[in-house]
Structures are given as C-alpha cells and as structure tokens.
Curated annotation (Swiss-Prot):
Main location as per UniProt: mitochondrion
Subcellular location(s) of the protein: Mitochondrion intermembrane space
Highest taxon in the source lineage: Eukaryota
Gene3D superfamilies given in the database record: Cytochrome c-like domain (1.10.760.10)
Function: Electron carrier protein. The oxidized form of the cytochrome c heme group can accept an electron from the heme group of the cytochrome c1 subunit of cytochrome reductase. Cytochrome c then transfers this electron to the cytochrome oxidase complex, the final protein carrier in the mitochondrial electron-transport chain.
Annotated residues for binding of heme c: 22, 25-26, 88
Protein name: Cytochrome c
Keywords, in A-Z order: Acetylation, Electron transport, Heme, Iron, Metal-binding, Methylation, Mitochondrion, Respiratory chain, Transport
Length: 111
C-alpha cells in the first residue's frame, strides 16, 4: 500500500513499537547522545545522513532524502531496499498500520 492509502496513525501504539523495535539503537530525546543509530530528535524535514556527530554510511549521505511522513513510510517498509548499503540492520515494518503508528509517534516525539 502506498502512503496515500496509509491508515491514520496512533501515536500511543507507535510509542510501543518504538520502545520494542527501535529504542535499542535510537533515542528521540533532545540533547541525548547517539546510540548505535543516530538520535532522531528533529528528524522531520532533515536530510538523510546529516545529523551532527553521527558517522553515517555513504549510502545514507548520498541518498539525500528529506525525512517526512511519506519517505519514512516507504523507508520503514524495507530500509535496505530504500537505501541500499544503509548500516541500519532493522528489517522493516511490513504492516501499514505499524508504520503509520510509528510515524505518528515520531512526529510528536522528535519535534
């Protein structure tokens, strides 16, 4: 399903997904350091591979995608297909509702 067909996201459900599937490598807390993956604070509207102080793969820098709801929706389906060569080992979220929920949470938590 494309982003245009995505269900509305539930940020509470998205927070649970973040805690179980993302938080071991990422944080959303402003001013917190990077973990294995970059801090996601300020994610929306930022270009991939540009968070200060994090060592990105050339793939993430060269892809130069602007993170927004649609790009995250596509990326989170299959990160390695969307950015071949990414360091992110997460296989993705296959269910449209899970992606919509996670994005709703990230929109609130990273602002």
């Amino acid at each position: 399903a494309s982003f245009d067909e995505a269900p509305p996201g539930n940020s509470k459900a998205g927070e649970k997904i973040f805690k179980t599937k993302c938080a071991q490598c990422h944080t959303v807390d402003k001013g917190a350091g990077h973990k294995q993956g970059p801090n996601l604070n300020g994610l929306f509207g930022r270009q991939s591979g540009t968070t200060p102080g994090y060592s990105y793969s050339a793939a993430n820098k060269n892809r130069a995608v602007i993170w927004e709801e649609k790009t995250l929706y596509d990326y989170l389906l299959n990160p390695k297909k969307y950015i071949p060569g990414t360091k992110m080992v997460f296989p993705g979220l296959k269910k449209p509702q899970d992606r919509a929920d996670l994005i709703a949470y990230l929109k609130e938590a990273t602002a």
